[in-house]
Amino acid sequence: DPEWHTLDAHEVEQVQATWKAVSHDEVEILYTVFKAHPDIMAKFPKFAGKDLEAIKDTADFAVHASRIIGFFGEYVTLLGSSGNQAAIRTLLHDLGVFHKTRGITKAQFGEFRETMTAYLKGHNKWNADISHSWDDAFDKAFSVIFEVLES
């Protein structure tokens, strides 16, 4: 796959450093995604139709946030080593399969990306170089996920 390659060392360093600054904000990140995009929240059977403000501080919400945002953290952690590329592809492929069965769309992944990027920008020193690194990280992830969604 000619489009699949690891990010360069500089990009990995930037992505990992900016991720580290927010990596423990799982509940706040998921809350921000759901608040901005109720259509994403509606895809979660445990939360569909519920008041976001009422569920934000519940154990169920914290567990889901940890699982969802933790997955993203796992991807970020694996970046940068050519030895991890097969593991990254498997992780992303499996994520694509799971989300395809739930009817998640490419547009909803785009909404997640948009909200996650805004959250990262708001909690880090941000510049065009960091933005480019994150664009590459999302592009690499989504190339595998979208391949599955389109199959």
Swiss-Prot record:
Protein family (similarity comment): Belongs to the globin family.
Highest taxon above the source species: Eukaryota
UniProt GO molecular function: heme binding; metal ion binding; oxygen binding; oxygen carrier activity
Pfam families, per the entry: Globin
Summary of subunit composition and partner proteins: Homodimer.
Entry keywords, A to Z: Heme, Iron, Metal-binding, Oxygen transport, Transport
SUPFAM superfamilies, alphabetized: Globin-like
UniProt-annotated binding residues for heme b: H64, H99
Limits of the Globin domain: 6-150
UniProt effect for mutating A48T: In second component
Coiled coil: none
Additional note from the record: There are at least 12 different components in Midge globin.
Protein name: Globin CTT-X
UniProt keyword annotation of Heme present: yes
Cellular component, GO annotation: extracellular region; hemoglobin complex
